[in-house]
Amino acid sequence: MASTNQKVVIIDTGCANVSSVRFAIERLGYTVTISKETSVVLNADKLFLPGVGTASEAMKNLQERDLVELVKQVDKPLLGICLGMQLLGALSEEQGQNGKELVPCLHLCDAPIKKLKTGNLPLPHMGWNTITPIDNHPLFQGIPAGSYFYFVHSYAMPVSTGVNDYTIAQCEYGQPFSAAIQSGNYYGVQFHPERSSKAGSQLIKNFLEM
């Protein structure tokens, strides 16, 4: 079990409401720092990368705050949440209102970010849904099968197959998509664990105790 004295940092991207993530971590007994300073980020034991809005706006924010290369230098466990998970991918279809080209993201995970094809189901995918994690992954330890998590999104990473197997949990909403990923020390969840009741709290606890 990791110590609650470890350095926990939420990266200050300028494109996220970090309060709910901070409170969820503090409820578990940890002290949280919100920062974009190089020394603070690189000395952290665990990091969170939250995000809201569009991929194009978020990447612009990261560039303006000199965070793109900094995030790539992180060698400790980092958890991207919602848009923060998508930013870990390669190219996003979510360009914003005036964009026509794919948005280059951090490319820490070799995955595209595509608009969900939901048939008659409405977009965004908003509300509670179940996920199917891979067996015995530590991020989902102690979380009962069939647990619900809270989603708000219109874009997602496909479920991975083959050599670049990044999917560690999947969800179904008109089509299967990656609900959680791992690429080395970078983790991501498409749902909001900080808004997902006991299951979400357990997931955050698991991440902090890795």
Curated annotation (Swiss-Prot):
One of its GO terms (cellular component) is cytoplasm. GO terms for biological process: L-histidine biosynthetic process. Its EC number is 4.3.2.10, 3.5.1.2. The active site is at C82 (nucleophile), H192, E194. It catalyses: 5-[(5-phospho-1-deoxy-D-ribulos-1-ylimino)methylamino]-1-(5-phospho-beta-D-ribosyl)imidazole-4-carboxamide + L-glutamine = D-erythro-1-(imidazol-4-yl)glycerol 3-phosphate + 5-amino-1-(5-phospho-beta-D-ribosyl)imidazole-4-carboxamide + L-glutamate + H(+); L-glutamine + H2O = L-glutamate + NH4(+). Pathway: Amino-acid biosynthesis; L-histidine biosynthesis; L-histidine from 5-phospho-alpha-D-ribose 1-diphosphate: step 5/9. Gene3D superfamilies: 3.40.50.880. PROSITE patterns: GATASE_TYPE_1. InterPro entries: Class_I_gatase-like, GATASE, Imidazole-glycPsynth_HisH. It comes from the Bacteria. Heterodimer of HisH and HisF. This is Imidazole glycerol phosphate synthase subunit HisH. It comes from Photobacterium profundum (strain SS9). The lineage of its organism: Bacteria, Pseudomonadati, Pseudomonadota, Gammaproteobacteria, Vibrionales. The gene is hisH.
